[in-house]
């Protein structure tokens, strides 16, 4: 019970600390996971990488039955992926969770892409790839 209270307090403090940040998060659910989890992507973070043409997307896991909403670095748990919508492959750019600092490695573009597979990957591609021409290029 004390752990649950400590976790709730940590989440509340993290949320309060980032509430004034200029970065807005707009999460859109794209898939159901195992054991009542859900996967969402942040539409405000998505962009097309100028160097590779890949669609870069932040996704987070949530569990509504435990009152855990999707969140970005510092408050949530998730990944940043670079998708090649035409070739249907993906590069994991970074992973994040509250207990570690968020960092995007400079060399992520040189990582070997992996073929997309599984229901969650397919759902992510279906949800975000139609918007590739409507996101900012960075």
What are these regions (language model features)?
Residues 13-21:
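C-terminal segment of classical bacterial N-terminal signal peptides
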Residues 11-12, 132:
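Alpha-helix boundary/capping residues
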Residues 9, 15, 39-42:
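Residues at secondary-structure transition points
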Residues 1-8:
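Bacterial N-terminal signal peptides that target proteins for export
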Residues 20-79, 84-138:
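N-terminal secretory-pathway/extracellular module detecting exported/lumenal segments
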């Amino acid at each position: 019970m004390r752990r649950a209270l400590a976790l709730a307090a940590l989440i509340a403090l993290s949320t309060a600390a980032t509430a004034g940040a200029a970065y807005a998060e707009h999460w859109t659910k794209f898939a159901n996971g195992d054991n009542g989890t859900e996967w969402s992507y942040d539409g405000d973070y998505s962009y097309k990488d100028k160097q590779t043409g890949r669609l870069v997307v932040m996704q987070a896991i949530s569990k509504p039955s435990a009152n855990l909403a999707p969140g970005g670095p510092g408050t949530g748990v998730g990944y940043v992926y670079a998708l090649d919508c035409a070739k249907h492959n993906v590069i994991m750019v970074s992973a994040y969770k509250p207990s570690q600092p968020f960092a995007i490695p400079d060399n992520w573009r040189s990582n070997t892409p992996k073929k997309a597979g599984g229901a969650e990957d397919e759902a992510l591609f279906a949800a975000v790839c139609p918007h590739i021409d409507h996101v900012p290029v960075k």
